[in-house]
């Protein structure tokens, strides 16, 4: 107990210092990891509803946000790593912001978004009561190498889960995970028609994807509308308005509904759907920022499938478009995956920026997409973008570190939600 209190004091002191300096959200967590590897397990050990791990290639941050808001609608007090820092140091940093001076966490349940590889290490220390496994897709090539490696990480998360795993029945690699765990399994999914709007690395643009409808699912996404969605739950179709856009975000919503109904089975469906209708996009994941009366959508892209789905959902909109691609560690160094994305849906791109601006411009040229300005410096590029057709709505497709930089730059010009 004394060690836990001392670690908490040191961590909070580092966190306070970093906040005064205006950065380093995960650094306090890194310090705590170095001095006391048992801090996270101790802080999470007494939660009445236990720990939930959300993992997979795409959709972790958005899905976690939905899960948290739905659980809160049922009356539970939820701890989460809401900044999207999904390594264990991010969890530790988030804990430092929530525990009291003695290191006690006041919460009913913890819902944690975790990177697939780091989740494997995490579950060796903290066994989750529930896990939600979304999908397995090719991510940055220099991270995991093979798609089956990523699948093996999710298998280990499931094997460590003590009570219940919630799986995507329509992702073959995720569906097979039920064979690797002793925990009970629940499924979510979507219809074949909707699945074909989401080409995977296995069935890219072939149109031959078929939903695994022979497997009963707790929640099935059946219809996607401009500002609404329909879900099949307990044999009944339920329609709700939504603030989230895109088939993939609404599939994330189906996943979240399935998980929450597993954790709180007595929760009324209408309460969950009402809460879902109010969920706004997670930061940088379709988040809308207003500048001088004009909307700017930040659209995170980090792998072929994610970029393809973003373009399918948003590429045809009549908006000024910017693309910003970096190759820092958090983005992935190997950006050759950009050649696996079809950009022909874009008529033109006003500004291309980031460390890989010229690589991105070359890629666009092969799909005959006209480019206005190429400027590697993100600050200069953003200024150029904002004055170009200033009254027209805008969208920025951006890699992770480009997104966080652009978000910070925009916060210096207009109101941006503080997620620290």
Regions found by a protein language model. Name each.
Residues 64-69, 78, 257, 357, ...:
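A generic structural signal for short, well-ordered alpha-helical segments in conserved domains
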Residues 58-60, 85-86, 171-173, 248-249, ...:
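Gly/Ser/Thr-rich loops at beta-strand to alpha-helix junctions
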Residues 2-184:
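Phosphate-binding loop of NTP-binding sites
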Residues 49, 133, 137-294, 371:
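Acidic, Mg2+-coordinating active-site environments of NTP-dependent enzymes
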Residues 83-86, 135-139, 190-193, 326-328, ...:
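Short, acidic/turn-prone active-site loops that include or flank metal/cofactor-
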Residues 112, 131-133, 167, 187, ...:
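Structural beta-sheet core signal
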Residues 67, 71, 91-95, 253-263, ...:
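Buried hydrophobic packing segments
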